[in-house]
Every structure is written in structure tokens, then in C-alpha cells.
Amino acid sequence: MIRRRTLLSLVPAVSMAPFAARAQTMEVRFGTSTAGGGFAPYAAALIDALKSVDPILDIKPVITKGATDNAERLQKGDIDIGLVSGEVMYEWLSEHPDKPKLRVISVIYSTPGMFAVRPDTRYHRIRDLLGRSIVWNPRGTGSAVQARYVMQGLGLDMDRDFDPIYPESFADGPTMVIERRAAALWGSGYRWPGFVELTNQPAGARFIVPTRAEITQIRAKFPFLAELTVPGGMYPGQYEPLTTVGAWSYILARPDLDDGIGYRLARSLFRAERSSMPSKHTVQTTARNTLAAVGSLDALQPGVLRFYREAKLVQ
């Protein structure tokens, strides 16, 4: 018996994460989004990544209206975890300071925001789009909320200074630009589906981002928006890097999520991160990025923080 204890004591603590939890199926309700935005392909890739390292972790996707809907459902306890953009998270915490806080499981990816227009138009700057019909995407989605903050940072109102379009589906936006029913489409993220569709058209697309002075102006009003760069070659015909603003998006947990679930999710995400073939959709979903993005360790779900400490990722 003494010898057995000695051998067990040599096994790293992180690999001894609750054996009972590993041996049991655990159901997690996961708020995603409607098709056509960046969350939908990410959610599918995340579920596949988690299944590859923890096959009996039963992630149940729940199709929602997007980031704001996910925040509302998390607060009510209707879902266990959900995808929420950084802009919606900032807004939710600001508007509901007295409610139990939604906690961070992990970052998803950073979301640089910009416009796409047909290349045969005369629009080259944001101010050129004033009064024009703009597809802001479905109301309450991370992209639409981000656009509102960016426009407010420039002293503009997305509803009064533009002719706003809020389609029911993300998929409607590119078609409206292609058919000239809209002058521009706002989107956020790398390889954002709407932009991929536009740039794959024979005519292609041209992107419009804030100028250097406009980026400074936006960040002066909303410091939580970071300066982000879309590398050249991300889309067909886009050869130069594009610098704009955006924020990290998150996997958030309901306030009373069991710490054992948080721990298991963090452990599985860490294993997926260290796998030899991470998905292109989840490559930014790392513990390092999560720790860099959160303002305080208190923002982390307690089970996640416990795993990070056992894995020696934080003190």
C-alpha cells in the first residue's frame, strides 16, 4: 500500500483531475447563433474539438439569436455556456452591475470590424457611406453591437446617419450588397462568412476600415476596443493588411454553473489547444489568450481558475 501511494504521488496533479468527472457523461447546454455569422462555424468546430479529447462530454448546441440573446439566456440559466462578443459582454456588465456576473470559460477569437463594398463603387472611407444603406446584420448580434460602438466612437449614429438594414439572417447581407440593394456590409472577425461570400464573387469586394485618426478617436471613447489587424491574404483580392478596431469574444458561463463543469471544460479546452491539429476556427482559443484578455482572474469561472492553477498557468 505504501508503494502504491508513492507511485500515485509522482503523477502530476493536473492529470489526476477528478476521475469521477472523466468517467461520467456530462451534459452542457451551449448557446450558439444563427447560421451565417462567425459564431456558427466556430461552435461546430469547438464541439468537434472537445469531442476529440473528451468523447463523453455531451455538448448540446442551442441555436439562438446571437450574442445578446446568449447573455440573456445565461443570466436566466436557460443555457450553461454561450458565445458572447466582447462588446456585448462589456455592455451587459455595464447595464447589469447588480446581477450575478457571467463568468469566462475561455476567449473565442478577436473580432476586427470593417465594411465591405462592391469594388466598382466610389466608397473608400467611412464618411463616404453616410446616408447610404448599410447592412448591420441581425439586431442584437455581436457584429451589430460592435458596429454601434464603432460608429458612436466616431460621433455617428448607425440608425440616423445611415439607412440601416437589420436582416433576419446573416446570410441575407452579402446578397443585398451583390444585388446593389445595400451599399455596404458590416462584419467582424477573420474569414468572416459574409466577407468570404462577397470576396468569392467574380467582382470581389473592397474593405473600408477606420483611418489612423479615427482609430484613435474610437479608442479614446471606448478603450475596451483594441487595435486589431487583419493580415493580408485573409480574403481573395485583399493583399494588404487592414488595421481596425475590435474586441475578444468569449465563451461565458451562467453565474451558478457548477465548478466541476467549468473545470472539465477548461481541462478539455487545454487538451484541444495542445492537440497536433487544432481547427482554424479555434486556433485563438487558448489559455494564454484568455489570461491576456480578462482584466482580472475574478472574471474567470471558479472551476476554470482552479484548473489554471493546477496546470501552473497562474499562481
Where are these regions (language model features)?
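N-terminal export signals
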Residues: T6-A23
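C-terminal segment of N-terminal export signals and the immediately downstream linker at the start
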Residues: M1, F19-V28
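Pocket-lining segment of extracytoplasmic ligand-binding domains
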Residues: G86-V88, P97, T121, M158-L257
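Ligand-binding clefts/hinges and TM-proximal coupling segments of bilobed small-molecule sensing domains
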Residues: R139-V150, L225-A293
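Short beta-strand-centered segments that line the small-molecule binding cleft or hinge
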Residues: K101-Y109
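Bilobed "Venus flytrap"/periplasmic-binding protein-like clamshell domains
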Residues: E27-V53, L57, T111-E179, K280, ...
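An extracytoplasmic/periplasmic, membrane-proximal ligand-sensing/linker region
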Residues: A171-D172, I178-R180, G189-F207, Q217-R219, ...
